[in-house]
Structures are given as C-alpha cells and as structure tokens.
Amino acid sequence: MSTGRQGIWLCPECGNHEPWKTRDRETNQIDRKCSNCDKRARVTLNRSNSGKGRKRNYQIWEREPTIDFGKIIEEAKKRNNKTLKNEVIRSKSEKATQEQLPPIWGLDWAPKNALFFTKKLPEKKVRKELLRFVAERHDGYLELISEVWISMQPSAQFNGETYHKFTKQFCQEVSKSLDERIWKPELSIIEGEEVIPMRDTELYLKRRNKRFMRDIRLCLRRVAYASSVDLDTHLQWQRWMTRTRAMDEHLKDLFSNGISTPDGGKFGGKGFRSTWQEGVVGCATSLNRAIDLSPENRHLADIIAPMIRDVGLALAVGQTPLEIFASQMGKSGSYMDGGNLDSGGRDLHIGNWEKGVLPPTAPLPIASATATGIALAAKLLKINRFHLAPVGEGCSSNGEFWEAMNLAGARGLPIAFMIQNNQIALDTFTVGQSGAETFGDKGHAMGIPSWTIDGSDPLQFHASTAASREYALDGGGPTLIHVETMRGCGHAHHHDDLYLGSVTGNPPGYVGRELLSYWAEKDPLPNHRDYCISIGANEKQLISMEKEEQAIVDAARKEMEEMPWPEGNTVTKGVTSRHDAESHTEQFERFEKDSREILSGPLNDGDLAIEFSNAPNSSTYSRAIQNAMVALAERHENDIVFMGEDMEVAGAFGMNIPLKAKGHSSKLLDMPLSESIIINSATGAALGGMRPVAEIQFGGF
C-alpha cells in the first residue's frame, strides 16, 4: 500500500496520460518525464475535491493512497487507449429505430450570445442562485458545483460579456469533472456493467451528465435574463398588475351585485379572480406578441393558453379590459361568439385567437393539450413560434395534461408548461394532489428540464419564460416552470367567506393562517411597487399610473354595461363551419312528428344499388381509404400530417403502405398510446396551420 501521494498527469505536448507517485504525503511537487514524447513536467500539486489539479498547463488527477498503484497504471492505460465508449447519445436518423435511446433534446444547448446587463451583477448573487437551484433539483452535486466555481476565481462583478464568457468556461469545467467520475479506480467495479439493460455505466452516466449540464446552462441563462431588465420594463409590469387588480375588484362587485338583464333579473357573470397571482404578467415581456406584429405576420406570434387565474397574462399580451368584462358577463361583443358578430356569451371565458390567446376550458387540460398541438404544427412547418401553457396544480393531476407533456417531451416541441401551485384546488389541499416533492418533478419524469420560481415576483416569470423561449426556439424542446404562489381569494367570488373567513368570524375560514400571512406579505403589487421606487421610479409617476389604470378599467366596465345582451336565437349560428344548429323549437317540432312515419326510399327492401365484386383487382373500403390518403398527401404536400398509433412502420393492417410507397413517409407521425392527445393535438395542429389526419387505431380504444 502506498504511503505517499499518487495519481495521473496529462502531458500537454502529446496528450499522453502518465501515472505518478511520491514517497510521502508531504511532497507537493512532481518532476516526471513523459514516456511518449520525453517532455519533462515539473508541477506543484494542487489538490481539489474533484480530484483534478489546475496549475500551469498540466492536468493532474490525484487518487487516494489506499488504492493499489497497479490500478493507477491501468487507469492511465485506459485513458490512453480511449476505452470509454464514444456512444451516440441520440440517433441522427430522421426516423426512430427500435434500438434508439430516448432523445435528449437540447443535448449540448448553450446560449449563443451575451445579454446586456442594466447594472453590474455581483458574483455572490449568481453563485447563491446557482447553488439554490442545484439544491432544489440536483443536491448531490452541491459540493462539485461550489468547488469548481471557487477554483475558477471569478471576478466580484460581471457585465453581460464577462458573465457569458465565465459561465461558458464554468460549464466546460463542470462537464469535464463529471466525465472524470468513471475513471476513478474505486468505481472500476461497475465499469462495463449494465446500469439497466442495454445501457452500461459509461453510456448511462454520460447521458445523465448531459441532462444535468442542460439544467445548469438554463439556470445560468435565467440569471442573465433577470439581470437584463430595465426600469421601464418593471414599470410596465407594475401597470399590468395594477390593471389586473382593478379588474378583480370590479369582477367581484359584478358577481356580488350583478347587472340588470332584459327579463328584469340580475346576472353576475363568471366568478374568478387572480389576487396575489398577478406576477404572471412578467411572462408577456418575453413573448413575441401578436399586437406588436403586422396583421400579415400575426400567425408567427407566440401563443398562450391561460387558465382562470391568468387574466393578468391575457391583459399583458393585448386583451383589453372591455374584452375581459364582455366575456365574463356574456355580452354580445364577447369574442366567445363562434365567429359570428354580436353572438357572444356562448362561453364566459377570456380568449382572443387573433391575439394568440386560447380560451381556458372547463375540462382543465384541454387548452394545454391544444397548445401542444399548435406547437407540433410550428415544429413540423418550421415556424419560429413559442407556446406557453400555464395551469394550476390541480390540473397537473389530470391525465390529459400528462399526455400533453409526454408528447412534447418525446417530440421536442417548442412549448413551456407552467404549473402554478397556489396551495389549493377549489377545496383540495396540495397534499391531496401529488406525492412528489415539487410539482417540477413531473417534468423530470418526461425528460423535460424544470425548475421552481417564486410566483410573487414578475421578474422570475420574465426570466424563466425568456430562457424557455430561447431554449425552445434553438431546438431544445419543452420546459416546465413550477411556480410556488397562493391565491389570495376563494376559488370564486362566492367562495371568499368559506376560504378566508367572514368578517363576522362565521364561517371562520379554513385556509391556514400562517400560510395566509406568509403570502400576504409577498403580495406582488405593493412589494414590486416598492422595488420600482428603490431602483429609480418616481412616486408621483406611480400614483398617476394607478389613477390612469383605474380610470381605464372603470370606463371599460361602463362600456360593457351599455353593450347589448346577445339575442337568444344567435346561439345556434355557426355551431359547425357547415351549418347552424337546430333551435329548441325546431327540435321539438321534429320530435312531435309521427315517428312511425317511414319516408319512401330510392330502393325497395332487398334491392342493391351496387354489386360487390369478388375479382382480385376490385376496390375495397380499405383501398379507397388508402387512395384518399395518398390524394390528400399530394394535394396538401407539407401541410398535412397523418398522426396516430403505429403510423411510421406501416399502420394498422398496412393502411399506410401506399403512402410510404409514394414517398410520403415524412408525413407519418407516431403518437404515444394516448387517444386524447391524438385528438387534442390534431385540433391544435389544425389551428396552427396544418391539415392533420388523426387516427384512432381501434374503435374499442
């Protein structure tokens, strides 16, 4: 057993690895000659926790003295012989093969350009956020990340350029340290062993390293985006949050008191608010908004699929207070009109397709699943468009949401999912929704990068969405942003007393007082307002803005109240693109007809209009369908996709063989075994500009 120090050094001249050892532990220098090129190395040893010295131009790996020196020699030989497999992490073939491993989207993604920082960024602030994220998602790497960071001796402050350069070098060093793990003699016992069938240690760890480094680069990029925000952007967020809070107060009043209806009654409209969740407006400044584009280019705008707490986000991307009021109160001018002017009120949700806002849906995940289909169309049509799908933690329990994330993860779609944990879904506490440590763990299960942000801070929404968008449009695929927040109101307006408690104390309210106090102190409006002042905003300017926003919302409410109610007969218009629906009167008239009356047909009983042939070249239903599919493929070219189960090999019963024979293999898309996402994503793909043909393989499914 050695009593000195030992390890391996790398010759900078020829790249040969040489073993070394000293007589005792006190020796801190080695003087050796390379056996390959005779280059002499005189190096001062610098022990590091990663086992790697960084002095001069030499790389030194020190091993524990308890390890047999023969294993050190063997390690050097392996390094020189390059015995670590240079496996392909992801197949480069256009179509999947059975042996192919799951794709790692964003495999070696890194930001291309530096961002401009509005002020110097303290090194300690970056390190703190980096270690916080590693503690959240990869706690086993805390010491490694800290050791490599400190060893690189960063400057006390960064600007955009120096930060970009340093973090690029930092990621390279961390990646090298991760790759070194398998060389350590104490791990040689699992060398070549399968971690799981068909994935040996080297390959498995290499893939894990790639995923880890992807997460680290995204974390550092979020820090960069947060450092590039100026005062004007903060003031814009404050304006949007103020507008949202003013809307909330009006919506509460409308629900409580109602407005007069033509029949002499009262109607209070939809009953949802966004209290304490207004910070989501920060996402909008990271998006390519439709309202900022010319009409002919609005199909290139980013798409959002907000839920009921995301009124602020809808306002921030361009919906007006009048649009929100009209939709929530079901007035004729609502965009929920089925495409027929003055026929609003069919649904009481927000939404405006021309502005890139999908309406929320009562089956909660439908909007997210549809947005996933729109993202699929963007990828297939090579449209540079990003998609954002926020939901609550309750919705994340739904199978259709999982199906959407799974498809996005499998196909690398340009979408960010956002799970906003506001601590309760109606009256179901978070502990009843999931056993995962964080809701971000759900993304990890799909191979999707995920992280957590504080939902009271619009800056974190902005930075996360910006990083997700850049990553997605660079080909990295989907991300999952987990938001910890809390709703400061009941599920709906009528629910406040049960949730928060009545002013009389009866009912007392069931929400935890400690939880309520914690999040009340984080209310984004007053806190962000104070922050704006701390970085240079003018108090008078803020007061003026607040009065202006209140006046805008007040005027919108007045205009909504003067807007006519929809005529009842408009509800049947445009239910499909081909025909109107029957009115109740028309349905009753049809029911009242004698059901025993049999209309005369063109044929008598037993007669056939078509004789079916038994000839081998005769047409069949399946052949007619095959011919129709080929005709559609040739008519619509790259705008069509045939999507379903088992599409890319041949299709059930060989239905897709003619398509492949005619050169249309690229139009076939295998879908996960999830019938709901097949239909929902096909719907989204149609909205996104494609002609999807969705196939459910068997009727019994």
Label every model-predicted segment.
Residues 403-407, 676-693:
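Small-aliphatic-rich amphipathic alpha-helix that forms the alpha element of a beta-alpha
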Residues 12-13, 36:
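Short, cysteine/histidine-rich loop/knuckle motifs that typically chelate Zn2+
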Residues 1-7, 24-26, 44-84:
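Short, intrinsically disordered terminal segments enriched in charged and Pro/Gly residues
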Residues 253, 262-411, 429-440, 445-447, ...:
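Cofactor-binding active-site loop characterized by glycine-rich and histidine/acidic residues
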Residues 77-282, 297, 489-663:
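Conserved acidic/glycine
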